[in-house]
Structure formats: structure tokens, C-alpha cells
Amino acid sequence: MPGDGGERCGSIGGMSTTGAREPGWVQDVIWWHVYPLGFVGAEREAGPDQAVVHRLGHVAGWLDHAVELGASGLALGPVFASGTHGYDTTDHLRVDPRLGDDADLDALIAACRERGLRVLLDGVFNHVGRGHPAFRAVLEHGPATPTASWFRLRWPDGADAWRPGTEPEYDDFEGHSALVALHHDEPAVADHVVEVMTSWLDRGVDGWRLDAAYAVPTSFWAGVADRVRARHPDAYLMGEVIHGDYAGFVAGAHVDAVTQYELWKAVWSSLNDGNFFELDAALTRHGGFLDSFVPYTFLGNHDVTRIASRLTDERHLAHALVVLLTTGGTPAIYAGDEHAFRGVKEDRAGGDDAVRPPFPATPRELSPLGLPTYSLHRELIGLRRRHRWLHTARTRTLHLANEQLVYEAVGDGGRLVVALSVGDRPAEVPAAGVRVVLAGNAEVADDRVRLPAHGWAVLEG
């Protein structure tokens, strides 16, 4: 893929660390995250003899949009054969026929390479769909089949009493019987995961998002990660972790990063409640994570309500984006958020559809109502790319009140000051050492910044 891979990092922000291991190229990545099955308008379920429909070219048609936005990487949701939503994988080595075939994915990877975009794939290795050949063999041939050890099975009346048609009980993923949990103590499972990951890295992708990584023992990930990096030392491995000991997981699993859900929640919750104390606490914890790894940061993804719908005041969408792009992390923009797409996730069958919509053939067909948000994304992404050190920047609070927050982002000799207000009246806040407004709307005088109602600004000396 484009550019020098560089060495794996051993320091963050000029400070020595013991856990930082990400590839050097990650410093410059801003992901544009796409959920392919929704993006291309694929059928909700794959048929038993699903014909190949060449739809991945639809994603390729939007790559110039990603580049113009300022993104430098494409983070793809599930692209492998599955029964429904992509997270019930039936073949990790074959593209979902609803999206196309392997040649289509190869072409998409090549199109990314031509534009200087890195590629991240979504790997579901905690569980498989019931239609996966390894589990299907168990149903057809019983406990003696070689892949029976891939799963935690409980046979009625015992394995010796098995008869054709007898189905075992099995561990699943969080109560979803369609998602059969893998047995991660089984060496053959690790061998399979390593084969899948290295096969696609061999074909030109740059890394993996590890779905439901929190549900898998860190010892399993550590063994897999070490074997994958033996062949692909510059591969980026990022695990989905919702809460808990982020730094401990990264160290134990030998991954580069995890999803930063704590910061995601604090951003929209603080803005909605007019309570910047919550965000301040989250930024303090975030700084602690940066001592050992660089989190994967985001405002939206395929699993959560769109940020434009989550916020109770649309004026605060800018504030949320400012925080994302002026704090340490590897940021991702969920496709559509840059045009203020709305969508509410619901806890029901099909409840994700609103946040995984089909996209038109080209960006020109989008509503012009989203253009101001698109322009803001371009402005702030451009600011971040001009200040590369923000990737590992630490924040320090300069002023804190319920409705106002001023913090400085510092790193590698650089310094920016961010001022935010969600109050209904203009606010004057301290901000020593700044003279220039880089983005936003503010007046600067005598080490103080005057913000309009619901205003924000990014400043420097």
C-alpha cells in the first residue's frame, strides 16, 4: 500500500512507552468507514444459491469523495460470505456474493492503492454463522467430525449416543443462536484465523478490525497477532472493545488499538446535558490510554445512532467533530456523518437499517442540506492533517464549567487551544498564549477568548 510502512512505534508524543506497537503509517490515517452491505443496497438475506452481484464497484465510485473529504484510509465493514448482516460469516476466504467476488474486492483494493488510501477489513473471529462449513459438518456428521473441536458442544445423551439429525447445544454470541461461538482454546481455530488474516494481507489490505474482540481471550489474540505479524509486521490490528480495561486488553492481546467508546459517549452526553465535566473526565482517562496505545476514535459507526440524531441540538455537531479531530487517536468518519445523515438504532430485528442505509450512485445525488457539515469536516480534517502530532496529542484543561470547556492539545512541540461553549449567551473564557483563530468563530484579546452563543474555536499562538 502507499507510502513507507515505517517501523512500529515505540514512543508516543516523544515519551517512551512499553505498550505502543502500532505501525508508523497509522499516524497519518483518517479512516472513512463504510458498511458495504448497506451501502450498496444488498438484499437483507443471502439466498441458498445466491448469485454473484457485482456491487463493490459502487463503493469504488465513492473513493474520490473520501479523498476529497481528507480521509487517507477506507475501513470496510464485513465483506465475506454470510447469511444476513455480514457478522454471521459462512466463508472468511470468499467475498459475499451479494457484494461480488474476489476479483471485485481485489479491484477495490487496487483502486484504494491508486488513491493513496489504506484498507482495513472487518474480521469476525469470535463466532461464525450456522451455515459455516465447519459447523455444518458438525450438524451432518456429528461429534466425530474433525471440526467438532472448533465449538463448545453439548450433545443430548452424550456424544456416543449421537444419531443423524441430532443437534447439539452450543455456546453462542450473547444469546444469538444464529451466531455460533468458536472454541478459542482449539489450535485449529487459531490456525484458521491466522490463515484468513494473512491471506487477505497478502492480497494488499493493511489491517484488521477484530469484531467482538472483547469476547475472545486475550491469550488467543496474542498468539494470532504474533503469528500474523511474523509475516506482516506492518499490519494494523484494532479490536472492538466497549468498556473495561482498554490498556490491559491492548497489552494482553498484542493488538495496536481498541475502539474508544468511553470518549464517544462522553462527547455526545456532555453536549446534550450541558455538562463538560463528563467530557473533561473522559479526556483525562483518554490521556492515560495514550501512554500505552493510540485509541481508535469515532463519533459514529454501523452499531450506534448517528451523531446528528444523537445530539439534541444540531449546532453542537461542530463541537463534537472538533473534539474528535483535536484529541489524540486514530479517527474514523462513518460514511454519511460528513453530510449529517440521520438515523436511530433500534433494539429490534432490522433495527440497524436506519444507520446502514444505501448510498446513491455518486455524491452529487446527495441532498445539498448536508453541504455545510461536509465543508466543516473538510476544514477540520485539513487542520488535523496539517498538525500530524495531534495523533498522539495530550490534552490539558485550561477552563472548565458546565457549559464551557477550554483545553490545550500538545505534542511534539505543537500546541493548539480549543474553546467550546454550549451556552445560550456569549461567553468569555481564559486562553493564555493564543492569538490566531484557525477555525471557528471567536474574538481574541488579552489572553481571553470571546465565543458567541453555542460557539467554538480552535486557536494557536
Regions of interest found by a model, annotated:
Residues 109-115, 132, 136-143, 195-198, ...:
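Active-site-proximal helices and loops of the catalytic beta/alpha 8
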